[in-house]
Amino acid sequence: MANVDYRKYMVAKPLYEAGGRGVKNRQSPAMTYMSNTLVPEADYYLTLAWITGIPDPNPHVFEHVHDYDEIVMFWSGDYKHPHTLGAEIVFYLGGQPIKFNTTTSFFIPKGLRHGPLIWKEYERPHMAMSLVLGCGDEQKIWGKSGIDVPKKDLPVKTEDIDYECYVIRSPMGELGDPNTTGRTYPSMTYMSRIQIPEANYYLECSWLYEMPHPNPHIKEHVHDTEEIVLHVGSDPDDPEDLGGEIELVLGGQPLRFSSNSAIFVPRGVPHGPLTWYACRKPHLEMAIMLGIGTFAEGWGGKLP
C-alpha cells in the first residue's frame, strides 16, 4: 500500500452518537471508536461505555434484533480483579435470561433477538462494549431494531435452544510470554471458535499495569485477515484518557497515542512493534481478529 498515510486507520477521538442519551450512571451516548464514518474501509461498529452505578432508567436497552453478528462484552475496571465484574446483570438472549457477575462476553448471531439488559446489583465501575460485525453504519444497525423502544412485558423464550451456548463467563489463557512483566499473563481469550463454534472471530485482551519488560515485546507481524487493535484506559472520570503513551508501527509508519485508541489493521498490512513510552495508569489492550477463530489461524501458533 504505497503512499498510504496510515493515520487514517487510527481513531484516537471517539464519536458520541450511539447508545442513547440521558441515561444516568452510564456514558450516554457511548464512545464510538470504529465506524464507517471514522474509518470508511472498516465495516464494523464498536462502542464503549463506562457504567458507574445502576443505570437509570433500568433497563435502558430493550429487546431488539438486527441483521449482523455482534459481540457484546462487559469487563471489570479493576486490573487486580479482572474476572470479577463489579455488578450483577441479566441479559436476555432469545427470551432466555442470562445472569452474570463476572467479566463476560456474548456472541449474538444475526437475527437473534436480544435484550433487555437489567442491572440487579452494582459494586464498582465496569465497561460495556458492543462490536457489530459487517456493518459500520449506526442507523442501518439500530435505526429500526427496537433497541430504544420500551416493552410492556419481558421477552419469552420460544425456541428449544439453551442460549448459554453463546456466553463466555471465563476466558481461555493461551497467549503471552511468561518472561514479559508488567502485563496480564496469559492474556484472556474471550471469543474464539473453540469456545463458540459459530463465532469465526478471535478476541483476546490483557491489562498493562506498569511499563512492560521487555519493551517492545510485540514485534512486527502480519495476518491474512482484518484486525482491530484496541487500547482503553481504566478511569471512568476521564474516560478518553489511556493512562499511558504507546507507539504502534503500522505499515512502517509510527502511530503514537496517549488517549484511548482503536486501530483498524487491513488484511496483509505489517504492524508492530508496539513500544510503551509511559504507563501512568492501568489500561487494557485488546486484539480482535476478524474472520478467523483460533490462535493458530491468527498467529500460526507462534507469538509475534
Give the location of each predicted region.
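Extracellular structured ligand-interaction cores
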Residues: 68-72, 86-88, 126-128, 200, ...
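A short beta-strand-loop-beta hairpin characteristic of the jelly-roll/cupin
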Residues: 74-101, 139-142, 231-258, 298-299
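Solvent-exposed interaction surfaces and binding hotspots enriched for charged
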Residues: 98-100, 170, 175-177, 193, ...
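Short intrinsically disordered coil segments
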Residues: 63-64, 88-90, 144-150, 220-221, ...
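A short glycine-rich, His/Asp/Glu-containing loop-to-beta-strand
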Residues: 26-70, 181-227
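Conserved metal-binding segment of the jelly-roll/cupin
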Residues: 93-120, 252-277
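Double-stranded beta-helix
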Residues: 1-19, 117-174, 274-304
